[in-house]
Curated annotation (Swiss-Prot):
Name of the protein described by the UniProt record: Inner membrane-spanning protein YciB
GO CC annotations on file: plasma membrane
Xref: InterPro entries: YciB
Protein's gene: yciB
Protein family per UniProt: Belongs to the YciB family.
Species: Rickettsia rickettsii (strain Sheila Smith)
Disulfide bond annotation, renumbered to this chain: none
Keyword Lipid biosynthesis (UniProt): no
Amino acid sequence: MLKFLSEIGPVIAFFAGFFYGGGIQHATLYMLITSVICITLCYVIDKKVSKLSIISTTVLLVSGSITLISGDSMYIKIKPTILYVIFGIIFLMSGIRKNPFIKYALESIVRLKEESWITLSYRTAAFFFFMAVVNEVVWRNCSDETWVKFKVFGVIPITFIFILLQLPLLLKNKLPDSKI
């Protein structure tokens, strides 16, 4: 539950900061503060922070700080693109190397045949590359308000749909001792 809250908390703070705090600058500040609090809480309570969370928070701190210092919202808008590309490369390379990163993230929930983990890695990489393109199209062609609404009300449903589309692969290739 803490992991979920640490990932959704900064998004909620960003949304609230934009619509109730006065725009991208406030939203960015709220997101930065919330992200630092969340990652600190994860470390204090769980004594660990995932590599993906560290990467995500680092990119946020850099792009968010540049946004606040420069006053240019472009930097916070390209943060998702940068993260999606980084994550896409991580999942793609782990599939190519036959050492699927996604296996370590999901193995406590589902156990699959090894080739299924590799397939899931490639699909996840493709999803992240797709999301990078979508983010670029939205932020470059839409208003700040539309981009913020897309980040909250578009990305989450798209991600959920992607996960649902993976269920047939998971169910077909799960091992007998799998939890799902």
